[in-house]
C-alpha cells in the first residue's frame, strides 16, 4: 500500500492486494485477493470486489447512482473476478427500484471512459470499448461487445454474443448473436466473427444462422 493512499480501517483487503499512490478506499469496501489499484483510484459505497481485478488511474467505483430518485438507500455493487477497469471508468451501485444491486460477473474488460449505471447486470467475458455507456437497469449477457462511443438506453437487454458497432444508439432489446450498427440500432445480421472467435461449433453456427433467416427473413 503506497503511503499516499487513504484506506479506511473498516475496509477489508484480501491477500496480495496492491494499492498504488493517491488511491482512496472508503468504509464498507471489500477487495479480495490479488486485486491491483495502479494509482488515483477511488472505491466507495457498499462495494464487494472479487479476486484479481485491476483498476487503472481515475477509475471511480461505487459512487452514488445518477438517479434523481436515489435517496441514499443501502444498495450494493458486486464485482466478480478477473475484470479490468481502465482509465476513467465509472460504476454505480443499485437503487431501490432495481433490486438494490449492480452486478458484474467475471473476465470483463471496461475500456477508457466507459460507464455502468445503477442496477445493471453484466455477464462474463463482456467488453465495453472506449466511452461506451450503459443506462440504468441494462442487462448485458455473456460474451457481448459494446462498441466505442455507443449508448445503451435504460432497461435494454443485450443478448449473449451480440456485438454493437461503434457510435450506435441502442433503444431496443438485442437478440443473442446479433450484429447491430448505426446512430439508431438496426439489425445487420449475425455476429459471425464473435462466434468464431469463441470457437462455437460450426454446426451450431449453421443452426443459429438458419433460425435467424427463418425469423427475420
For each of these PLM feature ranges, what is it?
Residues 180-198:
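Conserved beta-strand-loop-alpha-helix hinge in the C-terminal portion
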Residues 196-217:
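An accessory alpha-helical subdomain
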Residues 1-186:
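Structural signal for interior beta-strand "rungs" in well-ordered beta-sheet cores
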